[in-house]
Amino acid sequence: MKIRPDDQWRWYFDSEHSRVMLDLANGMVFRSRFLAKMLTDYAITMEEMPFSVDDAALYYAFEEHFRCINIASELRAELALNGVVAFRFMKPQMPKSWYFSSFSVMTKPEQGEIVQVRLQDCGTEVLFMVAEVGDSASLCLLAQQKLELSDRVMNFCDPIKIMNDRLMPYVEPTRETIYGRVI
């Protein structure tokens, strides 16, 4: 299912679920991943407000970057919408970069870019989406189903702030044919 931003969409905070919600105006409601304790006071006290042109532009910018990874359209929409919520409504976070190896490959990623990091303890590479770019650290959302860290488990779209020197550009794996190396 592919969703398209619409001027009928409305943001609101649902106190029963303690989350920012987006009424998609077609009988569907999107519930963000982020609990009230992670959100700004503005998000928690907001009245219903429209999904703005800036929100739509950000949604499409995020979605454009996802073309390089193989995930279902429903998950793309979920990641993009959670990215918009993270950018607009999340409280600032402190970096938690000790989980990841330093590379100094990237000085500053692009908003929405799919990046990879390498786990310090086992060398596994993990995909994230950059929701908000900072000068030295960026807020990222997990762009795969699950990540087991030494002291916690992250799920799809969970946020973490990572120092930019830990981020690497994601390079899509290439498929070689059996004749790919023939000279």
UniProtKB/Swiss-Prot annotation:
According to its UniProt record, where is this protein located? Cytoplasm
Q: Which Pfam families match?
A: ZapC_C (PF07126), ZapC_N (PF21083)
Would you kindly state one Gene Ontology biological process term found in this protein's UniProt entry?
Answer: division septum assembly
Major place of localization?
cytoplasm
UniProt key word Transmembrane: no
List UniProt keywords, sorted A-Z.
Answer: Cell cycle, Cell division, Cytoplasm, Septation
Which InterPro entries does the record match to this protein? ZapC (IPR009809), ZapC_C (IPR048372), ZapC_N (IPR048373)
- GO CC term (a single one): cytoplasm
Subunit info? Interacts directly with FtsZ.
Q: What does this protein do?
A: Contributes to the efficiency of the cell division process by stabilizing the polymeric form of the cell division protein FtsZ. Acts by promoting interactions between FtsZ protofilaments and suppressing the GTPase activity of FtsZ.
Similarity-based family:
Belongs to the ZapC family.
Which protein are we looking at?
Answer: Cell division protein ZapC
Originating organism? Xenorhabdus bovienii (strain SS-2004)
